[in-house]
A protein has these predicted regions:
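Short glycine/proline-enriched turn or capping motifs at secondary-structure junctions
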Residues: 133-145
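Conserved catalytic segment of ABC-fold P-loop ATPases
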Residues: 120-123, 136-138
Length: 154
């Protein structure tokens, strides 16, 4: 029996002006706004919307049902999750998946994990943080689970 080899690369992507994508990457059926950057070894799945002037660093995974607004930074190895494994394992039913929305001017540090949440504008997420709940006010957040550790400077 021959193996099934799926090669995706960059397929059916709505790419804005002056976007840089470094291969190898796996981008399909998503939207990437003007002046954005996507590093190598990044996967961005169908339906994802990336705003303008965003930087997605290497080895990040952005799953279906994620939207990222303008002027955001996604550090190396950041993982977005849309399935909470409520049945003890992955759900093949996309209707049970949850969405994530990232506001404007959000920076997410390397190796953070973002569960299905809403994050407001002007937030910094520390490296390695696990965001399990909505973030409704600007500031610096870190830890597992992520908690506000200080406000942004005025």
């Amino acid at each position: 029996m021959r193996p099934l080899l799926l090669q995706v690369g960059i397929r059916n992507v709505n790419i804005g002006e002056r976007v840089t994508c470094v291969e190898p990457c796996n981008l399909y059926e998503c939207t990437i706004g003007d002046d954005s950057f996507v590093g190598p070894f990044v996967e961005i799945q169908r339906g994802v919307i990336i705003g303008k002037r965003c930087r997605i660093q290497s080895h990040s995974f952005i799953c279906e049902k994620v939207s990222i607004s303008d002027d955001c930074f996604i550090g190396h190895g950041v993982m977005f999750v849309n399935d909470l494994f409520k049945q003890g394992g992955p759900s093949g039913n996309a209707e049970s998946w949850k969405s994530t929305h990232i506001g404007n001017q959000v920076s997410i540090g390397s190796n953070a994990t973002i569960l299905p949440v809403q994050i407001t504008n002007q937030v910094v997420i520390g490296a390695g943080a696990v965001v399990t709940k909505d973030i409704t006010e600007p500031g610096f957040y870190a830890g597992n689970p992520a908690k506000k550790i200080r406000s942004l400077p005025k």
